[in-house]
Regions:
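Transmembrane beta-strands of outer-membrane beta-barrel pores
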Residues: 462, 619, 633, 644-650, ...
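Beta/coil-rich, acidic/histidine-enriched accessory regions frequently appended to metallopeptidases
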Residues: 28-35, 40-43, 208-211, 235-355
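C-terminal outer-membrane beta-barrel translocator/porin domains of Gram-negative envelope proteins
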Residues: 594-597, 688-690, 703, 731-879, ...
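Active-site-proximal alpha-helical
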Residues: 75, 169-170, 174-185, 192-259
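A flexible loop/linker signature enriched in serine peptidases of the S9 family
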Residues: 290-292, 313-324, 341-354, 366-378, ...
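Juxtacatalytic substrate-recognition/specificity segment
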Residues: 26-167, 184-186, 203-206, 249
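Outer-membrane beta-barrel initiation region
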Residues: 558-559, 564-674, 738-761, 825, ...
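Repeated loop/turn-to-beta-strand initiation elements of outer-membrane beta-barrel proteins
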Residues: 433, 482, 635-640, 668-675, ...
Length: 946
């Protein structure tokens, strides 16, 4: 390629991004974010915060604004900093609504309780019915706003070419520390890490990611504040510009090296948690493990059976599933899969960290799952191994922990309304009639029927300690609706389940600082049944085992256990309920000024999110320059893209070769649509990258994207353009010139339900089918047509290993059929990327076995050691054939070998493949260069793993 053409390619590259939508449609995968309903956005304004909400979340928005302003004042004082710009808060009444947000480019996972976005400093968060959790998240995210503001202030005051990043444990740990600190679940994780000897050093923790970093970071910040003073936090942000990296800055500000402070922190943690060993015993000693990687167990015994079968959620295969196994005399049988989840729209999510299962006496499993826009209650027949019923309810977006009535005619569950409030509901079968049992702002969870069906016990934050996260057990009289305390105290009593055998309620409580199992009778007299140093949840009494089935946490993993109370674990009876109780708490923020504020309608206003530009100069030949700009509104529903470039040579002016693209995308509804206009001029290449042509064109286009479900969608593009084209090699493309109006249409069907590791997909299936047609309107003929199919299947062979299969087919025709190239490291390894393995007909098969080689990889650089995620190995076989109508006698080309996959930033990988070429039939018609005719080859690749 000449330098002139290189400059031309730089100039038109920006414009090609927009007009190349057909290529994106052919090769694009990914799951869908669906806007099931439109939101009528409104804005409440405080002193520092702009609160964006919709009418269903109006009351919640006022609570959010009041507490955000209160938190701002607290953080302003503690961090001695004022954020100079207004802070946008976008609040959603449920996580189901939050999953539709366009502020993030991906679907927020259920564990994501809030996010602070960098470009606009926006905070977005959902309400899940838990007031204390919500307040914690508000302050946590506001800490991130202050962190970004402090960083921006220092960057403006002391600009540097390179600014290093603070480690995740520092930033998230500070947000946790300044929010509320560790709760009992955080303590459970920290205790487990400390007692198991897995506590990392601060240097090692720098390379850790995931949820476990949050409590560890919070504990580190607490230790640093208590030992060295909280004032050093602000010093870190204001003086970090002086130092080359975090370790040097830390040593200067704290007066000791990171390694020394790491030893001090680990000793502090051991002093904190080692004494608990004298007060309890691990689950490995006190209980029998029934299942690994399992949570939310429930036991069911068929009338004719002497042993129970335990049902539970398990992600052992990557996807969440419902499993079952028999339990008899303390032992467990083989696991079987009952319901497969997270593969289709019917069982999109089981909410297995927050929702329980239940089984009726005749073997019908009741559970909830996300089904399109909201949750559904599913009834699964064990005998028939099929769905027996599915129920959705208007106005209820979330369904948690369904529980059967003793007579099997109804189910009670915890439901979250579209306004964000959590209440108890009862559904009657078979007609699905819904009855509301509670109606207030409190979070009511995990209901369970008494053996006579007259009373429902549940866990709720309606206790006097609820605003700070406390939960107690309550009982509801089904006939009268009266609610009264069953337990009382400043702790968390959770997951009650009423035993139909002894009439007791078995539940979990953290009243001694660790989640233990208790039992309480209808009079409120209880007994502690476990004293473990780990954690125990979701108990159920199994009479034939004379023990308790429960979920436990140990070795950083959840499992299912059975324990028999004995003299060591059964303690003296404890009176759990109080005679006189203080009144329930209320949302104090509703008494504040924001409660009476007037909301203004949201007005769409674009602001700049991203801008970039570049210049290329070839002395004596010419120059090229270009820039791109991306704008969006505050909610992220509307995007505006603008690109401009030009190419100037000795024989042309800047204005003569101006290229531009303007594109608007509307993501506010289920049907995403975009319109754009373009003008391009320069040298281009067909899909084979070996057929060059000069073209000057202008026109407009429309793009449509309609998700059928989270896993399936239809994409379409329509383009009308005025084109003047000159083929540089007319024998390859059908003619010397073309000047005409062209209408192009592309339609694609895409499915993707894959699971990913850092190095690429490991389970599931993804495929796309695309058809395209370009009409020459000026001459009344088909300019070109094409059809493309790409199927990829991933079969897991282990927790981190899989077989990856890819099948590709391509066909094109018309006056100027587009050729495809299947050579190179992305398709057919060991063969040239350009010019040779091209044609208008093609098929390709890839088979690769991927397996882990190392968990982590540390590389030493002159500036220090860097630790990266583990290396993956691979063994592969490729086989493909590409031809045209005039070269139909070509044989197939193949390659086999092994390689290594090195993850950088997911999904980008470095890939090194070494192998051997082989061929079938007549391969000489490809005209391969000499270096591609030898047997051995080495391929190096940077990009995405198929």
């Amino acid at each position: 390629m000449t330098m002139r053409r290189i400059l031309g390619a730089v100039a038109v590259g920006v414009a090609a991004l927009a007009v190349g939508g057909s290529a994106r449609a052919q090769f694009g995968f990914g799951q869908n974010k669906i806007q099931y309903r439109g939101f009528d956005w409104q804005v409440l304004r405080g002193d520092h915060v702009d609160l964006y909400h919709y009418p269903e979340a109006d009351e919640l928005a006022r609570v959010t604004l009041a507490y955000a302003e209160e938190s701002y004042r607290v953080l302003e004082q503690r961090l001695a900093h004022a954020v100079p710009r207004r802070i946008p808060f976008i609040v959603y009444a449920s996580h189901a609504d939050f999953e539709q947000t366009n502020i993030l480019p991906f679907v927020p996972p259920e564990g994501l309780l809030g996010v602070t976005e960098f470009a606009k400093r926006r905070v977005a968060l959902p309400f899940r019915g838990n007031y204390a959790e919500f307040r914690h998240t508000i302050r946590h995210e506001l800490v991130h706003v202050f962190q970004l503001s402090l960083g921006e202030e220092m960057s403006l005051r002391y600009p540097k070419l390179r600014m290093w990043s603070l480690p995740l444990w520092w930033t998230e740990g500070l947000a946790e520390y300044l929010s509320a600190g560790e709760d009992t679940r955080d303590e459970m994780i920290l205790r487990d890490l400390t007692l198991s000897g897995r506590l990392p050093t601060l240097g090692e923790l720098t390379w850790w990611y995931g949820g476990v970093v949050y409590p560890m970071g919070g504990a580190i910040q607490r230790f640093l504040a208590e030992t060295y003073g909280e004032w050093r936090v602000l010093q870190m942000y204001r003086e970090r510009w002086k130092y080359d990296d975090f370790e040097r800055a830390f040593a200067a500000i704290y007066g000791r090296s990171l390694e020394r402070v790491s030893e001090e922190w680990q000793h502090w943690m051991r002093q904190r948690y080692y004494p608990v060993v004298t007060e309890g015993r691990p689950l490995a000693i006190t209980a029998v493990k029934v299942a690994d990687l399992a949570i939310k167990p429930v036991a069911w015994r068929a009338p004719e059976d002497s042993a129970s079968e335990v049902f539970y959620f398990s992600p052992t295969r990557g996807y969440a599933e419902i499993h079952a196994r028999r339990v008899s005399h303390g032992g467990a049988g083989r696991s079987r899969t009952v319901v497969k989840g997270e593969r289709n729209e019917q069982f999109e999510s089981f909410h297995f960290f927050s929702s329980r299962l239940d089984v009726s006496h005749d073997g019908v499993v009741a559970f909830s799952s996300r089904y399109f826009d909201r949750d559904a209650l599913f009834l699964w027949s064990v005998a028939e191994n099929a769905v027996q019923g599915r129920y959705q309810f208007e106005g209820i977006v979330s369904i948690l922990s369904p529980s059967w009535a003793p007579d099997g005619r109804s189910v009670v569950f915890s439901g979250l309304s579209i306004t964000g409030y959590s209440d108890l509901y009862r559904v009657w079968f078979p007609d699905g009639r819904l009855e509301r049992l509670t109606r207030d702002r409190y979070e009511d969870l995990d209901p369970t029927f008494s053996p006579d069906g007259r009373t429902v016990a549940f866990s709720s934050d309606r206790t006097a300690f609820g605003s700070e996260g406390g939960r107690n057990l309550f009982r509801l009289d089904v006939a009268t609706g009266a609610v009264e305390h069953l337990t009382y105290g400043n702790w968390s009593d959770e997951t009650p389940r009423w035993s139909r055998d002894d009439g007791r309620i078995y539940f979990t409580s953290d009243r001694d600082g660790t989640f233990q199992i208790y039992a309480v009778d209808s009079g409120g007299t209880g007994r502690q049944l476990t004293r473990t140093i780990n954690g125990a949840f979701d108990p159920q009494w199994i009479p034939e085992e004379r023990g308790v089935l429960f979920g436990g946490f140990a070795d950083l993993s959840y499992g299912v256990y059975v324990a028999r109370p004995d003299a060591d674990t059964t303690l003296a009876p404890v009176q759990l309920a109080a005679e006189r109780l203080p009144p329930e708490w209320s949302w104090a923020e509703l008494d504040a000024e924001p409660a009476a504020a007037t909301a203004d309608p949201y007005r769409k206003k674009f602001s700049l999110d991203f801008a970039a530009g570049d210049v290329a100069v070839a002395p004596g030949i010419g120059s090229a320059q270009g820039a791109v700009f991306l704008f969006s509104d505050m909610i992220g529903d509307h995007l505006l893209y603008f690109g401009l470039s030009s190419y100037q040579s000795r024989s042309s002016s800047v204005l003569e070769n101006v290229n531009g693209t303007l594109f608007y995308l509307n993501q506010s509804r289920r049907m995403n649509w975009g319109v754009g206009a373009f003008r391009v001029k320069g040298t281009f290449y067909e899909l084979d990258l070996s057929t060059p042509y000069n073209e000057s064109s202008w026109g407009g286009f429309t793009q449509l994207r309609y998700p059928l479900s989270r896993y399936q969608r239809i994409e379409a593009e329509f383009r009308l353009e005025r084109s003047r084209r000159e083929d540089l090699f007319p024998s390859q493309s059908g003619g010397l010139q073309r000047e005409a109006w062209l209408a192009s249409n592309y339609l694609s069907y895409v499915k993707d339900n894959t699971l990913w590791l850092m190095t690429g997909p490991i389970d599931g299936v993804r495929y796309t089918l695309t058809g395209g047609l370009t009409n020459d309107l000026s001459h009344g003929r088909f300019d070109s047509w094409s059809a493309w199919g790409d199927l990829r299947r991933y079969l897991r062979t282990g927790l981190r290993s899989a077989l990856a299969l890819r099948l590709i087919g391509y066909m094109a025709g018309g006056e100027r059929p587009r050729q495809v190239n299947l050579g190179g490291t992305w398709f057919l390894r060991g063969y040239p990327r350009y010019y040779y393995v091209v044609g208008t007909r093609a098929w390709l098969a890839n088979l690769e076995w991927r397996f882990p080689l190392t968990d982590f990889l540390t590389i030493g650089f002159p500036f220090g050691a860097a630790r990266f995620p583990g290396v993956q190995g691979a063994m592969f076989v490729d086989l493909g054939r590409v031809w045209t109508p005039t070269t139909s006698d070509r044989g197939a080309l193949g390659a086999t070998g092994f390689g290594f996959r090195f993850p950088l930033a997911a999904p980008l990988v470095l890939r090194l493949d070494m192998g051997w070429r082989f061929r079938t039939g007549d391969w000489s018609r490809y005209g391969l260069p000499q270096q591609s005719r030898t047997s051995r080859f080495v391929d190096f690749f940077f990009g995405f793993n198929y």
